[in-house]
Design a protein with these regions (language model features):
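Short S/T/G/P-rich N-terminal loop/turn motif that feeds into the first structured element of a domain
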Residues: 1-75, 79-94
Length: 94
């Protein structure tokens, strides 16, 4: 498993829609294809325009499809709520 950090910028006023999808049965099913959801750590900026997730990825290709709009389940939601995202691979230094 790879530890990754995903930082997403949300469109104005779309935080609730984003979180609703991420916590829905449909969203959880897609997330489970990508990573171990029991280990995910999330954070949100005070203005609710940015989210950050540390995830433990077991399927890199599925993770890229999840965020880059090539996944047919996530695409309609991302088109509505997501401005941009960045993905970082994490490595422990100690």
């Amino acid at each position: 498993m790879k530890e990754m950090l995903v930082v997403g910028r949300l469109k104005e006023g779309k935080f609730e829609k984003f979180m609703g999808f991420m916590q829905s049965d449909k969203g959880m099913a897609e997330r489970k294809k990508v990573a171990d959801v029991t280990k995910t750590i999330g954070a949100v900026s005070p203005d609710k325009k940015a989210v950050m997730f540390k995830i433990f990825v077991h399927n890199i290709d599925a993770m890229h499809a999840f965020v880059d709009r090539s996944n047919p389940v996530t695409k309609p939601v991302w088109d509505e709520v997501m401005e941009s995202f960045e993905i970082f691979e994490l490595k422990k230094v100690r």
